[in-house]
UniProtKB/Swiss-Prot annotation:
Alphabetized UniProt keyword annotations: Calcium, Disulfide bond, Hydrolase, Lipid degradation, Lipid metabolism, Metal-binding, Neurotoxin, Presynaptic neurotoxin, Secreted, Signal, Toxin
Compartments, record wording: Secreted
Disulfide bonds: C42-C131, C44-C60, C59-C111, C65-C138, C66-C104, C73-C97, C91-C102
Binding, Ca(2+): Y43, G45, G47, D64
EC identifiers of the protein: 3.1.1.4
Catalytic reaction list: a 1,2-diacyl-sn-glycero-3-phosphocholine + H2O = a 1-acyl-sn-glycero-3-phosphocholine + a fatty acid + H(+)
Example of a GO biological process term: arachidonate secretion
Gene Ontology CC terms, in alphabetical order: extracellular region
Molecular function terms, GO-annotated: calcium ion binding; calcium-dependent phospholipase A2 activity; phospholipid binding; toxin activity
Lineage: Eukaryota, Metazoa, Chordata, Craniata, Vertebrata
CDD domains in the cross-refs: PLA2c
Protein name: Basic phospholipase A2 DAV-N6
């Protein structure tokens, strides 16, 4: 279900923030967010609960925590300035919210890139009901 929601959001907001995050993920991993990360493990994609399944899923958990710390921002919808050069993502000048959202996304994309070796296809499209353990705290 969360995968369908992500796809719908991406189709509606083609110029929005989620597409920016997808581009960062593509830069760092050479994989598109959909289908590789939109419903991976217990935390990659919309929402999250339970315990991260591996280091890749932990990147998404930390990203969720980063978003939770932002106050007065709309991290899933705000558009922010950024650039990249030879695989390095640089968050640009913008509002304080834009800078913080960009840094959350940049850190997650870098983390996913650094943990490509932990990526397991068995966690792609992982069903939410299998994420039963008590949720990890931020």
């Amino acid at each position: 279900m969360r995968t369908l929601w992500i796809v719908a959001v991406l189709l509606v907001s083609v110029e929005g923030h989620l597409l920016q995050f997808n581009k960062m993920i593509k830069i760092m991993t050479r994989k598109n967010a959909f289908p590789f990360y939109t419903s991976y493990g217990c935390y990659c994609g919309w929402g999250g609960r339970g315990w991260p399944k591996d280091a890749t899923d932990s990147c998404c958990f930390v990203h969720d925590c980063c978003y939770q710390k932002l106050t007065g921002c709309s991290p899933k919808w705000d558009i922010y300035p950024y650039s990249w050069k030879t695989g390095v993502i640089i968050c640009g000048e913008g509002t304080p919210c834009e800078k913080e959202i960009c840094e959350c996304d940049r850190a997650a994309a870098v983390c996913l890139g650094e943990n490509l070796r932990t990526y397991k296809t068995k966690y792609m499209f992982y069903p939410d009901f299998l994420c039963k353990k008590p949720s990890k705290q931020c």
